[in-house]
Amino acid sequence: MVQYRELVIALILLLSTTVPEVHSRSLSDRGRRDWMVYPDALASYIYEAVNTVSPRAAQFLLDVSQTTVVSGARNLLIRETTKITILVEQMVEKIRSIWNGKLGY
């Protein structure tokens, strides 16, 4: 049983999500910069599948996903991926301006 709990905790940390946030927004409602769309959706599907088999295990998943450690890790990932996305968008704009300015396209 201990290995099962460790596996579930590792899965939740890997997905870095909180289940209630997944249900609050659909995939199409999210912005371009939100890289957490796919882990959130996957966590939602896993939660729903576990809930149909064992509501008690689903409640355990929900409790683990709402811990401060998981929320902190998720917030860190969101913050860092947002920074990376902004930098990539700035780089693309610079490349476009060089392309249009120097080459005249």
Curated annotation (Swiss-Prot):
Tissue: Produced by the liver, secreted into the blood and then sequestred by receptor mediated endocytosis into growing oocytes.
Keywords associated with the record: Signal, Storage protein, VLDL
One GO location term (cellular component): very-low-density lipoprotein particle
GO biological process: lipid metabolic process
Molecular function GO terms recorded: enzyme inhibitor activity; nutrient reservoir activity
Signal sequence interval, chain numbering: 1-24
Record bears the keyword Ubl conjugation: no
InterPro entries in the cross-refs: Apo-VLDL-II
Function: Protein component of the very low density lipoprotein (VLDL) of egg-laying females. Potent lipoprotein lipase inhibitor, preventing the loss of triglycerides from VLDL on their way from the liver to the growing oocytes.
Family of the protein in this entry: Belongs to the apovitellenin family.
UniProt subunit comment: Monomer.
Name the UniProt record assigns to this protein: Apovitellenin-1
Organism: Coturnix japonica
